């Protein structure tokens, strides 16, 4: 099920008949969707609906799970992602992933942010310094952290650690950002501040957010896909989905009558 797009819209991500299995459990069941360049898409649904499994298929994180099997087609700018010839590290730089639990490294703030660049072979100090400052400005932390760059990132509040992780993804120059329940470990105030960061990033990146925070989905996304048992039950413009859903199951979920 794919929302209609004007033919002039440039499609960044194309997903066709995507299936994901974990051993015998069929977690994603043949979904199809198009995501336009620099649009923000929310994947909503109850726990176990397949939201996170879709995100992890997009940048090949399921490769790390021997129990996982992925079939179908995922393309970024028309190039197949799931093929054997795909440069997976390069793909993951193009599609940065941010998890609910901050993946903070036991390193300084600076080394956390430039970690991906160093892994890519970048060693020129001015390049690293500029990338670190730019990325921390993008997540609205530069003014607060510019004098703490060489202190441990693990000493930061959890919400700042999450933003440092976003900065690490930004430093390598991604085109797509994948957020998997990014606020799930944060208190309401910190979650709102993180939403402010993501809102600022919307104009420059294609963004997918898998979230069970309906306020987050409503505020940040252009399109919303509601998933049930690995399938897309309803999709469309976010304002329409939240105000005038056509599927009674969507209405029940948004009203809090279908949580699991």
State where each predicted segment sits.
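ABC ATPase "signature
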Residues: 235-236
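ABC ATPase NBD coupling module
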Residues: 67-69, 80-96, 119, 241-245
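Catalytic Walker B motif of ABC-type/P-loop ATPase nucleotide-binding domains
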Residues: 177-180
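Conserved ABC ATPase "signature" region
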Residues: 73, 79-80, 126-147
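Conserved signature/switch motifs of ABC ATPase nucleotide-binding domains
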Residues: 172, 203
């Amino acid at each position: 099920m794919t929302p209609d797009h004007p033919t002039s819209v440039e499609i960044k991500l194309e997903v066709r008949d995507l299936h994901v299995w974990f051993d015998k459990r069929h977690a994603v069941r043949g979904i199809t969707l198009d995501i336009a360049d620099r649009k923000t898409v929310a994947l909503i649904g109850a726990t176990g609906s397949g939201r996170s499994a879709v995100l992890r298929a997009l940048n090949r994180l399921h490769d790390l799970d021997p129990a996982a099997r992925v079939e179908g087609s995922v393309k970024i700018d028309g190039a197949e992602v799931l093929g054997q010839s795909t440069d997976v590290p390069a793909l993951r730089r193009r599609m940065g992933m941010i998890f609910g639990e901050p993946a903070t490294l036991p390193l300084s703030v600076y080394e956390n942010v430039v970690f991906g660049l160093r892994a890519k072979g970048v060693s020129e100090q001015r390049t690293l310094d500029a990338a670190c400052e730019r990325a921390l400005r993008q997540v609205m932390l530069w003014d607060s952290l510019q004098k703490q760059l060489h202190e441990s990132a693990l000493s930061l509040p959890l919400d700042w650690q999450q933003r440092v992780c976003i900065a690490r993804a930004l430093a390598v120059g991604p085109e797509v950002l994948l957020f998997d329940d990014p606020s799930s470990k944060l208190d309401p105030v910190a979650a709102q501040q993180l939403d402010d960061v993501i809102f600022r990033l919307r104009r420059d990146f294609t963004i997918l957010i898998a979230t069970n925070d309906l306020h987050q989905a409503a505020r940040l996304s252009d399109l919303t896909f509601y998933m049930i048992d690995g399938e897309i039950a309803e999709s469309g413009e976010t304002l329409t989905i939240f105000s005038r859903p056509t599927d009674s199951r969507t209405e029940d979920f948004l009203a809090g009558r279908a949580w699991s």
